[in-house]
Protein backbone atom coordinates (compact mmCIF):
# COMPACT_ATOMS: atom_id res chain seq x y z
CA UNK A 1 0.00 0.00 0.00
CA UNK A 2 1.37 3.42 -0.96
CA UNK A 3 0.11 5.05 2.26
CA UNK A 4 1.72 5.14 5.68
CA UNK A 5 0.36 2.60 8.17
CA UNK A 6 0.20 2.55 11.95
CA UNK A 7 3.49 0.59 12.00
CA UNK A 8 5.30 3.49 10.30
CA UNK A 9 4.90 5.96 13.20
CA UNK A 10 6.23 6.27 16.75
CA UNK A 11 3.27 6.10 19.13
CA UNK A 12 4.90 6.03 22.58
CA UNK A 13 3.52 8.70 24.89
CA UNK A 14 1.43 10.17 22.07
CA UNK A 15 -2.28 11.00 22.11
CA UNK A 16 -3.28 9.04 19.00
CA UNK A 17 -6.59 9.86 17.28
CA UNK A 18 -8.24 6.77 15.80
CA UNK A 19 -11.30 6.56 13.53
CA UNK A 20 -12.94 3.17 14.05
CA UNK A 21 -16.23 1.82 12.74
CA UNK A 22 -18.36 0.94 15.76
CA UNK A 23 -21.62 1.41 13.86
CA UNK A 24 -23.09 -1.77 15.36
CA UNK A 25 -26.74 -2.87 15.53
CA UNK A 26 -28.43 -2.21 18.88
CA UNK A 27 -31.70 -3.60 20.20
CA UNK A 28 -33.00 -2.07 23.44
CA UNK A 29 -29.48 -0.81 24.15
CA UNK A 30 -27.89 -4.24 23.64
CA UNK A 31 -25.37 -4.91 20.84
CA UNK A 32 -26.72 -7.69 18.59
CA UNK A 33 -23.61 -8.08 16.39
CA UNK A 34 -20.16 -7.07 17.66
CA UNK A 35 -18.13 -7.98 14.54
CA UNK A 36 -17.07 -4.40 13.87
CA UNK A 37 -15.77 -3.93 17.41
CA UNK A 38 -13.80 -7.18 17.17
CA UNK A 39 -12.39 -6.12 13.77
CA UNK A 40 -10.90 -2.94 15.29
CA UNK A 41 -9.15 -4.69 18.20
CA UNK A 42 -5.78 -5.43 16.50
CA UNK A 43 -5.17 -1.74 15.78
CA UNK A 44 -6.33 -0.54 19.21
CA UNK A 45 -4.23 -3.19 20.99
CA UNK A 46 -1.17 -2.33 18.90
CA UNK A 47 -1.45 1.38 19.79
CA UNK A 48 -1.74 0.75 23.53
CA UNK A 49 0.98 -1.93 23.50
CA UNK A 50 3.29 0.63 21.87
CA UNK A 51 2.56 3.03 24.75
CA UNK A 52 0.16 5.25 22.84
CA UNK A 53 -2.97 6.84 24.30
CA UNK A 54 -5.85 5.83 22.01
CA UNK A 55 -8.63 8.37 21.45
CA UNK A 56 -11.35 6.66 19.44
CA UNK A 57 -13.97 8.26 17.18
CA UNK A 58 -16.99 6.50 15.64
CA UNK A 59 -20.50 7.21 14.46
CA UNK A 60 -23.53 5.10 15.36
CA UNK A 61 -26.60 5.25 13.13
CA UNK A 62 -28.07 8.54 11.92
CA UNK A 63 -28.68 11.46 14.29
CA UNK A 64 -30.79 14.21 12.75
CA UNK A 65 -32.34 15.88 15.78
CA UNK A 66 -31.84 16.11 19.54
CA UNK A 67 -34.40 13.37 20.26
CA UNK A 68 -32.37 10.87 18.16
CA UNK A 69 -29.44 11.03 20.58
CA UNK A 70 -31.00 8.93 23.35
CA UNK A 71 -30.87 5.61 21.49
CA UNK A 72 -27.61 6.35 19.66
CA UNK A 73 -25.09 6.74 22.46
CA UNK A 74 -21.84 4.77 22.23
CA UNK A 75 -22.08 3.92 25.96
CA UNK A 76 -22.93 0.21 25.31
CA UNK A 77 -20.00 0.06 22.87
CA UNK A 78 -17.61 1.50 25.48
CA UNK A 79 -18.68 -1.23 27.93
CA UNK A 80 -18.30 -3.99 25.30
CA UNK A 81 -14.89 -2.70 24.22
CA UNK A 82 -13.69 -2.54 27.84
CA UNK A 83 -14.67 -6.20 28.31
CA UNK A 84 -12.86 -7.21 25.10
CA UNK A 85 -9.70 -5.28 25.98
CA UNK A 86 -9.73 -6.32 29.63
CA UNK A 87 -9.24 -2.71 30.77
CA UNK A 88 -11.27 0.42 31.41
CA UNK A 89 -12.37 2.57 28.49
CA UNK A 90 -12.79 6.23 29.44
CA UNK A 91 -16.14 7.48 28.12
CA UNK A 92 -16.90 11.16 28.82
CA UNK A 93 -20.14 10.94 26.80
CA UNK A 94 -19.56 14.14 24.80
CA UNK A 95 -18.10 15.09 21.41
CA UNK A 96 -16.38 18.36 22.41
CA UNK A 97 -15.75 20.75 25.28
CA UNK A 98 -13.85 21.10 28.55
CA UNK A 99 -14.98 17.75 29.97
CA UNK A 100 -13.67 15.85 26.92
CA UNK A 101 -10.41 17.82 26.84
CA UNK A 102 -9.77 17.22 30.56
CA UNK A 103 -10.38 13.47 30.17
CA UNK A 104 -7.99 13.30 27.20
CA UNK A 105 -5.28 15.28 29.00
CA UNK A 106 -5.60 12.95 32.01
CA UNK A 107 -4.91 9.82 29.91
CA UNK A 108 -1.80 7.80 30.65
CA UNK A 109 0.20 5.65 28.23
CA UNK A 110 -1.75 2.53 27.22
CA UNK A 111 -5.17 3.96 28.10
CA UNK A 112 -8.20 4.16 25.80
CA UNK A 113 -10.87 6.85 25.51
CA UNK A 114 -13.99 6.72 23.33
CA UNK A 115 -15.52 10.01 22.16
CA UNK A 116 -19.33 10.05 22.01
CA UNK A 117 -21.10 9.35 18.66
CA UNK A 118 -19.59 11.73 16.09
CA UNK A 119 -22.99 12.17 14.47
CA UNK A 120 -24.25 14.02 17.55
CA UNK A 121 -22.53 16.86 15.68
CA UNK A 122 -25.06 16.44 12.84
CA UNK A 123 -27.92 17.89 14.90
CA UNK A 124 -26.60 21.40 14.34
CA UNK A 125 -25.94 21.77 10.60
CA UNK A 126 -24.63 18.25 9.85
CA UNK A 127 -21.12 19.24 10.89
CA UNK A 128 -19.79 15.65 10.92
CA UNK A 129 -21.42 14.42 7.69
CA UNK A 130 -20.65 17.61 5.75
CA UNK A 131 -17.01 17.66 6.93
CA UNK A 132 -17.23 21.01 8.70
CA UNK A 133 -13.65 22.40 8.59
CA UNK A 134 -13.77 23.84 12.12
CA UNK A 135 -14.92 20.52 13.59
CA UNK A 136 -12.17 18.57 11.81
CA UNK A 137 -9.61 21.11 13.05
CA UNK A 138 -10.95 20.91 16.63
CA UNK A 139 -10.89 17.12 16.78
CA UNK A 140 -7.38 17.09 15.28
CA UNK A 141 -6.24 19.48 18.05
CA UNK A 142 -7.10 16.86 20.69
CA UNK A 143 -4.17 14.64 19.65
CA UNK A 144 -0.43 14.87 19.11
CA UNK A 145 -0.37 15.01 15.31
CA UNK A 146 -1.08 11.34 14.52
CA UNK A 147 -4.39 10.08 13.10
CA UNK A 148 -5.08 6.41 12.41
CA UNK A 149 -7.97 5.62 10.08
CA UNK A 150 -9.21 2.07 10.67
CA UNK A 151 -12.80 2.63 9.57
CA UNK A 152 -13.08 1.05 6.13
CA UNK A 153 -16.88 1.16 6.42
CA UNK A 154 -16.83 4.97 6.14
CA UNK A 155 -13.78 5.34 3.85
CA UNK A 156 -16.07 6.22 0.92
CA UNK A 157 -17.38 9.25 2.85
CA UNK A 158 -15.66 12.59 3.39
CA UNK A 159 -16.61 13.33 7.01
CA UNK A 160 -15.05 15.53 9.67
CA UNK A 161 -13.97 12.46 11.67
CA UNK A 162 -11.90 10.98 8.85
CA UNK A 163 -11.03 13.42 6.03
CA UNK A 164 -11.41 16.47 8.31
CA UNK A 165 -9.00 15.21 10.95
CA UNK A 166 -6.57 13.90 8.28
CA UNK A 167 -6.23 17.39 6.80
CA UNK A 168 -5.15 18.86 10.14
CA UNK A 169 -2.53 16.41 11.44
CA UNK A 170 1.12 15.81 10.63
CA UNK A 171 0.60 12.13 9.81
CA UNK A 172 -2.61 10.34 8.81
CA UNK A 173 -2.04 6.58 8.57
CA UNK A 174 -3.98 3.38 7.93
CA UNK A 175 -4.86 0.92 10.68
CA UNK A 176 -4.55 -2.84 10.20
CA UNK A 177 -8.19 -3.37 9.22
CA UNK A 178 -8.16 -0.62 6.59
CA UNK A 179 -4.83 -1.93 5.27
CA UNK A 180 -6.21 -5.48 4.95
CA UNK A 181 -9.44 -4.34 3.30
CA UNK A 182 -7.56 -2.40 0.65
CA UNK A 183 -5.03 -5.19 0.13
CA UNK A 184 -7.63 -7.91 -0.34
CA UNK A 185 -10.22 -6.05 -2.42
CA UNK A 186 -8.00 -3.78 -4.51
CA UNK A 187 -5.44 -6.49 -5.25
CA UNK A 188 -8.20 -8.95 -6.16
CA UNK A 189 -9.55 -6.53 -8.74
CA UNK A 190 -6.33 -4.93 -10.02
CA UNK A 191 -3.83 -7.83 -9.92
CA UNK A 192 -5.85 -11.05 -9.51
CA UNK A 193 -4.54 -14.55 -9.85
CA UNK A 194 -6.59 -15.96 -12.73
CA UNK A 195 -9.14 -17.26 -13.49
CA UNK A 196 -10.88 -14.34 -11.73
CA UNK A 197 -14.65 -14.77 -11.28
CA UNK A 198 -16.94 -12.06 -9.90
CA UNK A 199 -20.39 -12.91 -8.56
CA UNK A 200 -22.95 -10.14 -8.18
CA UNK A 201 -26.37 -10.51 -6.61
CA UNK A 202 -28.86 -8.26 -4.89
CA UNK A 203 -32.10 -6.79 -6.06
CA UNK A 204 -31.21 -3.77 -8.21
CA UNK A 205 -29.17 -3.35 -11.37
CA UNK A 206 -29.06 0.40 -10.62
CA UNK A 207 -26.94 -0.26 -7.49
CA UNK A 208 -24.37 -2.27 -9.43
CA UNK A 209 -24.03 -0.65 -12.90
CA UNK A 210 -20.58 0.82 -12.20
CA UNK A 211 -19.40 -2.38 -10.51
CA UNK A 212 -20.57 -4.58 -13.41
CA UNK A 213 -18.90 -2.28 -15.96
CA UNK A 214 -15.59 -2.27 -14.07
CA UNK A 215 -15.61 -6.01 -13.41
CA UNK A 216 -16.44 -6.86 -17.03
CA UNK A 217 -13.08 -5.28 -17.88
CA UNK A 218 -11.17 -6.94 -15.03
CA UNK A 219 -12.74 -10.38 -14.46
CA UNK A 220 -12.77 -13.48 -16.67
CA UNK A 221 -16.43 -14.14 -15.85
CA UNK A 222 -19.19 -12.18 -14.10
CA UNK A 223 -22.05 -14.26 -12.68
CA UNK A 224 -25.35 -12.48 -12.02
CA UNK A 225 -28.01 -13.58 -9.51
CA UNK A 226 -30.58 -12.09 -7.16
CA UNK A 227 -33.48 -9.83 -8.08
CA UNK A 228 -31.53 -7.99 -10.76
CA UNK A 229 -31.63 -11.17 -12.86
CA UNK A 230 -35.15 -10.28 -13.94
CA UNK A 231 -34.22 -6.87 -15.32
CA UNK A 232 -31.63 -8.65 -17.50
CA UNK A 233 -34.26 -11.26 -18.49
CA UNK A 234 -36.87 -8.68 -19.46
CA UNK A 235 -34.26 -6.76 -21.47
CA UNK A 236 -33.99 -9.91 -23.62
CA UNK A 237 -37.75 -10.40 -23.91
CA UNK A 238 -37.94 -13.30 -21.40
CA UNK A 239 -41.19 -13.58 -19.41
CA UNK A 240 -40.66 -12.67 -15.74
CA UNK A 241 -44.19 -12.90 -14.27
CA UNK A 242 -44.46 -10.61 -11.25
CA UNK A 243 -40.72 -10.60 -10.53
CA UNK A 244 -38.89 -7.47 -9.46
CA UNK A 245 -37.87 -5.36 -12.45
CA UNK A 246 -36.40 -1.90 -13.00
CA UNK A 247 -38.23 -0.76 -16.12
CA UNK A 248 -36.00 2.31 -16.45
CA UNK A 249 -32.85 0.16 -16.54
CA UNK A 250 -33.80 -2.23 -19.38
CA UNK A 251 -31.65 -0.33 -21.89
CA UNK A 252 -28.72 -0.36 -19.46
CA UNK A 253 -29.09 -4.12 -18.96
CA UNK A 254 -29.24 -4.66 -22.72
CA UNK A 255 -26.12 -2.53 -23.25
CA UNK A 256 -24.22 -4.44 -20.54
CA UNK A 257 -25.13 -7.77 -22.15
CA UNK A 258 -23.89 -6.54 -25.54
CA UNK A 259 -20.68 -5.15 -24.06
CA UNK A 260 -20.00 -8.34 -22.09
CA UNK A 261 -18.99 -10.55 -25.05
CA UNK A 262 -20.24 -13.65 -23.26
CA UNK A 263 -18.49 -12.83 -19.96
CA UNK A 264 -21.81 -12.10 -18.23
CA UNK A 265 -23.43 -15.36 -17.08
CA UNK A 266 -27.09 -15.28 -16.06
CA UNK A 267 -29.14 -17.92 -14.22
CA UNK A 268 -30.96 -20.48 -16.38
CA UNK A 269 -33.82 -21.14 -13.95
CA UNK A 270 -35.45 -19.75 -10.79
CA UNK A 271 -37.25 -20.80 -7.67
CA UNK A 272 -40.62 -19.09 -8.03
CA UNK A 273 -43.48 -18.44 -5.60
CA UNK A 274 -47.02 -17.12 -6.06
CA UNK A 275 -46.40 -14.28 -3.57
CA UNK A 276 -43.46 -12.64 -1.80
CA UNK A 277 -45.01 -13.26 1.61
CA UNK A 278 -47.91 -15.55 2.47
CA UNK A 279 -47.27 -17.68 -0.63
CA UNK A 280 -48.97 -21.06 -1.00
CA UNK A 281 -46.84 -22.48 -3.79
CA UNK A 282 -43.06 -22.66 -4.35
CA UNK A 283 -41.51 -24.48 -7.31
CA UNK A 284 -38.57 -24.52 -9.72
CA UNK A 285 -39.08 -23.06 -13.17
CA UNK A 286 -38.39 -25.24 -16.22
CA UNK A 287 -36.10 -22.65 -17.78
CA UNK A 288 -35.52 -18.92 -17.59
CA UNK A 289 -39.16 -17.82 -17.91
CA UNK A 290 -41.10 -17.15 -14.70
CA UNK A 291 -44.76 -18.25 -14.70
CA UNK A 292 -47.61 -15.77 -14.89
CA UNK A 293 -48.74 -14.80 -11.38
CA UNK A 294 -45.42 -15.94 -9.86
CA UNK A 295 -42.18 -14.16 -8.99
CA UNK A 296 -38.60 -15.41 -8.92
CA UNK A 297 -37.12 -15.32 -5.41
CA UNK A 298 -33.93 -17.39 -5.83
CA UNK A 299 -31.85 -19.01 -8.54
CA UNK A 300 -32.87 -22.60 -9.31
CA UNK A 301 -30.97 -25.93 -9.18
CA UNK A 302 -29.85 -25.77 -12.84
CA UNK A 303 -28.37 -22.31 -12.21
CA UNK A 304 -26.55 -23.54 -9.10
CA UNK A 305 -25.00 -26.33 -11.22
CA UNK A 306 -24.12 -23.84 -13.98
CA UNK A 307 -22.48 -21.43 -11.53
CA UNK A 308 -20.64 -24.33 -9.87
CA UNK A 309 -19.20 -25.22 -13.28
CA UNK A 310 -18.31 -21.56 -14.00
CA UNK A 311 -16.40 -21.40 -10.71
CA UNK A 312 -14.39 -24.58 -11.31
CA UNK A 313 -10.68 -23.81 -11.17
CA UNK A 314 -11.17 -20.17 -10.11
CA UNK A 315 -8.20 -18.71 -8.23
CA UNK A 316 -9.76 -15.36 -7.30
CA UNK A 317 -13.45 -14.88 -6.49
CA UNK A 318 -15.15 -11.66 -5.40
CA UNK A 319 -18.77 -12.03 -4.30
CA UNK A 320 -21.19 -9.19 -3.57
CA UNK A 321 -24.92 -9.75 -3.12
CA UNK A 322 -27.03 -12.84 -2.36
CA UNK A 323 -28.61 -15.04 -5.04
CA UNK A 324 -32.09 -14.84 -3.54
CA UNK A 325 -34.15 -13.88 -0.49
CA UNK A 326 -31.73 -15.82 1.73
CA UNK A 327 -33.37 -14.68 4.99
CA UNK A 328 -36.19 -17.11 4.12
CA UNK A 329 -35.18 -20.82 4.30
CA UNK A 330 -37.30 -21.52 1.17
CA UNK A 331 -35.02 -19.24 -0.87
CA UNK A 332 -31.57 -19.95 0.61
CA UNK A 333 -30.45 -22.76 -1.68
CA UNK A 334 -28.96 -20.50 -4.37
CA UNK A 335 -26.86 -18.48 -1.94
CA UNK A 336 -25.70 -21.62 -0.10
CA UNK A 337 -24.93 -23.40 -3.39
CA UNK A 338 -22.81 -20.53 -4.67
CA UNK A 339 -20.98 -20.15 -1.34
CA UNK A 340 -20.15 -23.87 -1.30
CA UNK A 341 -19.02 -23.74 -4.94
CA UNK A 342 -16.64 -20.86 -4.11
CA UNK A 343 -15.01 -22.29 -1.00
CA UNK A 344 -14.39 -25.78 -2.42
CA UNK A 345 -12.03 -24.47 -5.12
CA UNK A 346 -8.42 -25.46 -4.25
CA UNK A 347 -6.20 -22.50 -3.36
CA UNK A 348 -8.87 -19.92 -4.13
CA UNK A 349 -8.65 -16.38 -2.75
CA UNK A 350 -12.30 -15.74 -1.87
CA UNK A 351 -13.54 -12.29 -0.90
CA UNK A 352 -16.99 -11.18 0.22
CA UNK A 353 -17.72 -7.51 -0.39
CA UNK A 354 -19.63 -6.79 2.82
CA UNK A 355 -23.32 -6.03 3.26
CA UNK A 356 -25.93 -8.77 2.72
CA UNK A 357 -23.38 -11.27 1.40
CA UNK A 358 -21.41 -11.02 4.63
CA UNK A 359 -24.61 -11.46 6.65
CA UNK A 360 -25.49 -14.51 4.54
CA UNK A 361 -22.08 -16.13 5.09
CA UNK A 362 -22.25 -15.49 8.83
CA UNK A 363 -25.90 -16.55 9.27
CA UNK A 364 -25.49 -19.66 7.13
CA UNK A 365 -22.30 -20.80 8.87
CA UNK A 366 -19.79 -20.32 6.03
CA UNK A 367 -17.91 -17.23 7.21
CA UNK A 368 -14.74 -19.03 8.35
CA UNK A 369 -14.31 -20.65 4.94
CA UNK A 370 -13.68 -17.35 3.10
CA UNK A 371 -10.29 -15.63 2.77
CA UNK A 372 -11.73 -12.20 3.61
CA UNK A 373 -15.12 -10.76 4.54
CA UNK A 374 -15.25 -7.00 4.14
CA UNK A 375 -16.64 -4.85 6.96
CA UNK A 376 -17.85 -2.14 4.58
CA UNK A 377 -20.70 -2.62 2.13
CA UNK A 378 -20.73 0.81 0.45
CA UNK A 379 -16.95 1.25 0.64
CA UNK A 380 -16.22 -2.16 -0.87
CA UNK A 381 -18.74 -1.49 -3.66
CA UNK A 382 -16.96 1.76 -4.57
CA UNK A 383 -13.59 -0.02 -4.50
CA UNK A 384 -14.99 -2.73 -6.81
CA UNK A 385 -16.23 0.06 -9.05
CA UNK A 386 -12.68 1.41 -9.29
CA UNK A 387 -13.45 4.64 -7.43
CA UNK A 388 -11.03 6.53 -5.20
CA UNK A 389 -12.15 6.46 -1.55
CA UNK A 390 -11.87 9.91 0.13
CA UNK A 391 -10.88 8.42 3.50
CA UNK A 392 -8.01 6.56 1.86
CA UNK A 393 -6.94 9.41 -0.43
CA UNK A 394 -6.57 11.68 2.63
CA UNK A 395 -3.87 9.49 4.22
CA UNK A 396 -0.16 10.40 4.14
CA UNK A 397 1.89 8.94 1.28
CA UNK A 398 4.83 6.68 2.13
From Swiss-Prot:
GO annotation, biological process: gluconeogenesis; glycolytic process; positive regulation of fibrinolysis; positive regulation of plasminogen activation
A GO term from the CC aspect: cell surface
Catalytic activity: (2R)-3-phosphoglycerate + ATP = (2R)-3-phospho-glyceroyl phosphate + ADP
Record bears the keyword Nucleotide-binding: yes
Principal subcellular localization: cytoplasm
Binding-site residues for substrate, renumbered to this chain: 21-23, 36, 59-62, 119, 157
Cellular localisation: Cytoplasm
Pfam (any one): PGK
Gene3D superfamilies: Phosphoglycerate kinase, N-terminal domain
Matching InterPro entries: Phosphoglycerate_kinase (IPR001576), Phosphoglycerate_kinase_CS (IPR015911), Phosphoglycerate_kinase_N (IPR015824), Phosphoglycerate_kinase_sf (IPR036043)
Chain positions recorded as ATP binding sites: 208, 296, 327, 354-357
Family that this chain belongs to: Belongs to the phosphoglycerate kinase family.
Protein name, UniProt field: Phosphoglycerate kinase
Annotated organism of origin: Streptococcus pneumoniae serotype 2 (strain D39 / NCTC 7466)
Amino acid sequence: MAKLTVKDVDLKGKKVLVRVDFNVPLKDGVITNDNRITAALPTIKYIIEQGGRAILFSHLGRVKEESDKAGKSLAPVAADLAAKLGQDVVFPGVTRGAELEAAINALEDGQVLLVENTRYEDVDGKKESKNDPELGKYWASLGDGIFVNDAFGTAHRAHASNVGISANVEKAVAGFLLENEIAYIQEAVETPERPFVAILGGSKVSDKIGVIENLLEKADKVLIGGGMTYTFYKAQGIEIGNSLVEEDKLDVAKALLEKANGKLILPVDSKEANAFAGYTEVRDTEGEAVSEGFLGLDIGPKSIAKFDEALTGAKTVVWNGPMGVFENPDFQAGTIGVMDAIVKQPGVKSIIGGGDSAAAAINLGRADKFSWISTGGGASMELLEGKVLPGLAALTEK
